Amino acid sequence: MASVAAAAVSVPSFSGLKAETKAAPARLSSTSVVRMAPVVRASASSDALKTVGKALLAASSSLLLVASANAATVKMGGDDGALGFYPKDISVAAGESVTFVNNKGFPHNVVFDEDAVPAGVKTEDINHEDYLNGPNESFSITFKTPGTYEFYCEPHQGAGMKGVVTVS
């Protein structure tokens, strides 16, 4: 029968002590395989970055042109069915367009008051007297002459469906 003897062990305190670790040297056997990461030439990498940079520049320039071509969008009628233009006050630069979109499907149009447009502007050139009857029907007007343009919806003018475009 085997006997087990117990021994008293004292454990020192390790507060403030730092353990030192050393890695054992690696040993390779004759059958070890070493793989190396692929090497990328700096010029190939910078050429790729230049190409990506040019593509991003072209894409952002295109977006800016699209954004300036459609400077503002005005909903004809509110999301809740209210009669109005949203927003009712619009500011654009000369040469920019405003797109009017029928929001809910009530018949709407846009008529400019001939006494409330800049001198020399012919309202018949910018009025859209035909009704937009369906949701998402739209048209755009490009404003060339700086000034203030007051407009309204003919069937809903009495309900306060009016707006102003300010062209700088």
From Swiss-Prot:
GO terms for molecular function: copper ion binding; electron transfer activity. Its cofactor is Cu(2+). It holds the Pfam family Copper-bind. Keywords: Chloroplast, Copper, Electron transport, Membrane, Metal-binding, Plastid, Thylakoid, Transit peptide, Transport. Cu cation binds at H108, C153, H156, M161. Its main location: plastid. Gene3D superfamilies: Cupredoxins - blue copper proteins. PANTHER family: PLASTOCYANIN MAJOR ISOFORM, CHLOROPLASTIC-RELATED. InterPro entries: BlueCu_1, BlueCu_1_BS, Copper_blue_Plastocyanin, Cupredoxin, Plastocyanin. Belongs to the plastocyanin family. Disulfide bonds: none annotated. Participates in electron transfer between P700 and the cytochrome b6-f complex in photosystem I. The keyword Plastid applies. CDD domains: Plastocyanin (cd04219). Transmembrane segments: none annotated. This is Plastocyanin, chloroplastic. GO terms for cellular component: chloroplast thylakoid membrane.
